[in-house]
Amino acid sequence: MRNSLPSRPALSASRTKEYQRCPLQFRLHVVDRVKEPPTQATLLGTTVHATLENLYALPREERNETLALELLRTEWEKTLAADPSVMNLFTDHADFERWHERMNSMIKNYFAIEDPQALEPLSTEALVEATTSQGINLLGYIDRIDQAPNGALRVIDYKTGKAPSPRFQEEALFQMRFYALLLSLTKRLPKRTQLVYLASQKVLTFDPDSADISRFSEELSRTWESMRRDALQGYFAPRRSPLCNWCGVRTMCPLFDGTTPEIPTSGLERLLAMGPQRSDQ
């Protein structure tokens, strides 16, 4: 379940990739714990993911499109009752209706991609925690793990955003390699990992092997060493990219005339606790 709490400070796939793109953005989210306001995109993603999790909690024969749309409506009503202010994300009723229709279409599209009545997942929204041989703590909330009769594992991650072009597919697979490493440390290397893009009905498949995941583990170690150096010197550099246009903490970035807050010592200590402890910390 997504509401399961990690047992210790650890790196996630999204935050690790975030550091590689922009150390300052990573710092503000992980060290300072700056919370960004919800957006239409994050609201849609959260609601759709919860719906698919609830779908697989049903008996196999009940997992049909009609009932899935009812689950979606229930999940949305629960979200709205808990926080009516989410309606402020929409400019008017027409804007909300367009958003709501996109959400419905993603659930319908899911049934064109997979038959949930033919599947019996090993887990949904599972919190997986592990420590690498280098002593780096990792975690991931994995949308779905399937297990074949022969024991082979398949990792599924639902995506409500746009499918990447071939040029950017390797970056999208960072998360799948991260999850493959997690499972290799806790269960066994998955036979297959898939990113399921609900809007376009595209599926990006990656079949990991031990050599690839070993190289990825080494990449994580190098990234961790860079994080650690930044933490010890108390400086995480901003890095300009086209993604700056969508950055939720840009007002705190010096590249955009923002003021970066003083770095909290407690946050640095929490970050350093994600890796092996050394005498120079």
Residue ranges and their predicted role:
Residues 40, 44, 99, 103, ...:
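Hydrophobic (often cysteine-bearing) scaffold residues that line and stabilize catalytic clefts
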Residues 24-32, 49-52, 82-83, 156-160, ...:
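Short acidic (Asp/Glu) and glycine-rich catalytic loops that position anionic groups and cofactors
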Residues 1-42, 272-281:
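C-terminal, charged and often intrinsically disordered regions of DNA end-processing helicases
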Residues 51-124:
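A non-catalytic, helix-rich entry segment at domain boundaries
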Residues 32-41, 57-63, 166, 233-236:
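Short, polar/flexible loop-turn hinges at active-site or ligand-entry regions and domain interfaces
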Residues 10, 150, 182-281:
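Metal-dependent nuclease catalytic regions and adjoining charged, substrate-binding loops involved
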Residues 18-26, 47, 65-87, 189-198:
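Short, compositionally biased low-complexity segments
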Residues 122, 126-222:
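Mg2+/Mn2+-dependent nuclease catalytic core
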